[in-house]
Amino acid sequence: MNVFGIILAVIAIVVGYGIGYYVRKNVHEKELDVARNTAEGIISEAKRAAETHKKEKVLEAKEESHRYRAEVETELKQRRNEVQKQEDRLLQREETLDHKENTFEKREDALGKKEDKIANEQKRVEQQQQSAASLITQRQAELERVAALSQEQARDQILTQTREQLTHERAVLIKENTDEVKAQSEKEAKNLIVQAIQQSAADMVSETTVSVVSLPNDDMKGRIIGREGRNIRTLETLTGIDLIIDDTPEAVVLSGYDPIRREIAKIALEKLIQDGRIHPARIEEMVEKARKEMDEKIRETGEQAVFDLGLHGMHPDLIKLVGRLNYRTSYGQNVLNHSIEVAKLAGVLAAELGEDVTLAKRAGLLHDIGKAVDHEVEGSHVEIGVELTTKYKESPVVINTIASHHGDVEAKSIIAVLVATSDSISAARPGARSESLENYIHRLEKLEAIANNEDGVKKSYAIQAGREIRVIVKPNEISDLQATVLAHDVKKQIENELEYPGHIKVTVIREVRAVDYAK
């Protein structure tokens, strides 16, 4: 090998080493860059993961805090409610104790008054005994005076004088007792009734026997009548209601005395008008649907009335009968509204007297329950109501209340008396009831006839829409004290022979005129 070849070999080695070093350096730097980038990516990802984890932990902590706060607030609210309920119960107990205390005080006052009354009666009896002894003495003297008369003449004279004196004493006694009873009872009764009326509000009513259905146009009248009147005949036959189609624009009148059948006809007709298909088969289908809808409506009405009054445990069939009262009127007054009003009034009066409020409301709501079916079953609404409540196992107090609220039988409980009183208040309220002109005129004529049939009556006049009768008497036949007796007798006869809402005032007028002429 020559020197040149060695030099070339050395140069080649050096160059190869340099190239290898350069290549290796580049590769190493690239690997470092890759490693650096990878490390930075891992660090960045770790930071993001740490940040995400941190946010999740913060959110979890906030949620836990909110949940804990909600639980604490709920628990605090429950405790507040419990404390409030306890306070309400304590307050209610205090009110109950106050009410019982007032009741006891009233009863003590009543007992004191009764004791005073008994003492007065004893004094009166003693006075009457003294009067009787004096009368015997007078009669003995009278017998001695009339000894010269015949036996028959003496007997007639004594009987006449005794009769006149007894009539006078009877008139005085009636007047005294009437004044005493009014003075003691009216004050307490008015207070109770005023409190009850203040807590009761009701609408004025009017009786109706027709319903009006609006039509989209007058062409619908022809479709309702149908070919040769078959549609209207079918509807009238199925519902028992008369359809009156006249010149009234866009309206059909439904006439009938049964409000339930009239309402069924109205619902069915409105459905037919809305559907547009009016023919006998469709009419039958809609009437059947209306009946089912009406039954459900009656049931819901009864349940709502029972719920509003806070009553429980009433038989479902009885609740349905309560709902039927919404479609029954008495002197133009809706019987369901009247029954609810009576129930509320009876409840208020019962609370004032310390009686069972719930039982009073129950008796008040059911007192006219017989009117729900009195047009379907024979008998008065009182008899029917007693049968229904007995059948559905109502309380004996409720049954007696129904039987006695018109005075047919004796009231056996205070609640029965309260319901009868509430019934009178509801019926006598101005605007509560109306009556037909024929019944009104007949009642006025009967009222005047009762007064005119009494001896010594010159003329009588029914005024104030029949709520007062003024009786003018002959002064030479009726004395002032006899006028008191006459007013009492007329009042009793009116109570026995007439049916009327509220009360009737009897006024007897005795006028004496003395006329002379100066010459």
Curated annotation (Swiss-Prot):
One biological process term in Gene Ontology: mRNA catabolic process
Membrane topology: Single-pass membrane protein
EC number: 3.1.-.-
Principal location class: membrane
HD domain boundaries: 335-428
One Gene Ontology molecular-function label: RNA endonuclease activity
Recorded superkingdom: Bacteria
Entry-linked InterPro entries: HD/PDEase_dom, HD_domain, HDIG_dom, KH_dom, KH_dom_type_1, KH_dom_type_1_sf, Ribonuclease_Y, RNase_Y_N
Annotated PROSITE patterns: HD, KH_TYPE_1
Chain ranges passing through the membrane: 3-23
Keyword Mitochondrion part of the UniProt annotation: no
One cellular-component annotation, GO: plasma membrane
Cited CDD domains: HDc (cd00077), KH-I_RNaseY (cd22431)
Residue ranges annotated for the KH domain, each copy included: 209-272
Keyword Chloroplast: no
Subcellular location field: Cell membrane
EC class name: hydrolase
Keyword terms: Cell membrane, Endonuclease, Hydrolase, Membrane, Nuclease, RNA-binding, Transmembrane, Transmembrane helix
SUPFAM superfamilies: Eukaryotic type KH-domain (KH-domain type I) (SSF54791), HD-domain/PDEase-like (SSF109604)
Family indicated by similarity: Belongs to the RNase Y family.
HAMAP family in alphabetical order: RNase_Y
Summary of the function given for this chain in its UniProt record: Endoribonuclease that initiates mRNA decay.
Protein name: Ribonuclease Y
